[in-house]
Amino acid sequence: MKKAVTLLDGSVGQELVKQYGEKPTPLWSTEIMLKDPNMVSNIHSAYFEAGATVATTNSYTILRDRLKHFELEHEVHNLWNSSVAAACKARDKFGSGRIAGSIGPLVASYRPDICPP
């Protein structure tokens, strides 16, 4: 029996740190989505070209409670859409592939007893 292999992309976040050239902040990967979503799309493209068949959205830190601390909670939907669009742009450029969403840690994000609103 032949088994299929699904190859995910690598660490989008660490590539952003490497390519962005600035020290990461609590919003570093989210900040890139606001300033230069093409950088994210280019990273996805490089992973597709290297053989990945799935691009993971750059959305791990796009959490309303985190954004609220920086008065950016109104951007949550725009940022999610932008992270999906960046991955789709790379996939469409490559010609094939799938997109997987990346959701941050549930404990810190969704438990009001640990992380109050």
Where are these regions (language model features)?
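Domain-level signal for soluble alpha/beta catalytic cores
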Residues: M1-P117
